[in-house]
Every structure is written in structure tokens, then in C-alpha cells.
Amino acid sequence: AGFEFSASIAFLTVVAICFGLPKMQLDHTASIQNELRGLKNTQMWITLAVGAIGFGGLFSVYSYVSPILTEYTHASIQVIPFALACIGLGLVIGGLVAGHFADKNLNKAIIWVLVSNACSYVLCALSMDHLATAFIALFLVSFSIAGLGPLLQTRLMDVAGNAQGLAASLNHSAFNIANAFGAFLGGWLISQGFGWLAPIWVGVLLSLGGLMILLLAFQHEKKSISACK
């Protein structure tokens, strides 16, 4: 039933895209050569690295939320769908809120997303003893990180120049790397005996790692602007 439900949502999404998106003019100046030149763009690669590292914490927690709740919190297996729904709700609301702040200042919005996400993991690790606080913490984890994807996508469009298509596709690849890397680190630490909360602490480190890379991107950008003057 889960697959049929997912397929139904996918079909409704296709219908919404067909009737809801405005028609856009094709960019006839786009070319494969221009796209490939984007591979030399340092800012594009650094921004992609922010997503590949900074978003990994969510996947570290999401991949092991079921055993964390059942083995550490000692919750019933029946609550897992509600926990996942709580995470999904946080992603929806968080994306809307982050978009509002991005309209005011994109770079500051990305910084605050990563900082607040790191704090949410700390709160989550300290809140998993009780089911109610665990649900709240899981919501905050997804709420705080939800905006990172679209915010980085927007920044990529700003720095990619004529390689817009390449940047957009690589952004998805970066988040797939985050998916694999976060889940791997969380699982590896559990296998090494660091306990069920280890994936949550991985989230703290990865969010801060993404923040450090972002600050490096800003510094590199300032140097590039100064060099052009």
C-alpha cells in the first residue's frame, strides 16, 4: 500500500507541475561547452561541498531513527510512522520559513540554517530519553535543515554563471553524497560501540563542517572580488 500511495502522490505532483508552472522561454544561448566550463568554477564546487557535508546529519538521524526510538527511547515500533511523519512535517514548514528569510539575505539565511541545525542535534541527543521530547526534537532537526537544499540551489544559480543546468544537476548529486555519507558515518559509529545516539552527534559535526566550508566560500568570494578591482 505504501508504494501505491507514493505513486499517487507522484502522479498528483506531475499534474500540478503541468498546470501550475508558468511557461518559460527556452535559453537558446545554452550549450554543452558553457556548461562544462562551469567545472572550473571554484565557488560552485565549494557550494556543492556545503550541501554534501552539511546535509549529511539529517540522513544520519533519519536512517537510524527507528532503532534509536525502539532501542534507546524504548518506544513501541508502532510510533515509528508518526515519528517519520513528524520529520516530514518539519521539512515542509522549515522550507517555507527558510525561504522567507532567504528573500531578505541569502547568505545569512544559509548560515543560520546550519547553526540552528547543529543546535537542534544537540537538543535532540539530550531529548531522546522521553518519547514526547524525542518527537519535538526530531521535528526541530528537520525544520532547521529543510531550507538548506533550496537555499544552496539559489546560491548555485548566482555563482554558476552560464553553467546553470550543470550546477542544478550537481546539487542533487551533492545531496545524494550527503545521504550516503551521513548514513555510513552513523552506522559505522554504532557498529563501533558508540551507542544509538552516535548518529545524532554525527549531525552536529556535519552541520558545523558544512558551516566551515560555507565561510570558506564567502572568504574565497571576497578575495575574488578584491582581485578584480
Predicted regions and their residues:
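C-terminal membrane-cytosol helix-exit motif in multi-pass small-molecule transporters
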Residues: 2, 7-27, 213-217
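Juxtamembrane intracellular "pre-TM" segments in multi-pass secondary transporters
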Residues: 20-50
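Helix-to-loop junctions at the C-terminal end of transmembrane segments
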Residues: 93-106, 190-191
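A late C-terminal transmembrane helix in Major Facilitator Superfamily
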Residues: 158-196, 200-203
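C-terminal transmembrane helical hairpin of 12-TM major facilitator-type secondary transporters
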Residues: 106-152
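Multi-pass alpha-helical transporter architecture, strongest
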Residues: 17-18, 201-229
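Extracytoplasmic gate region of multi-pass secondary transporters
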Residues: 43-85, 89-92, 106
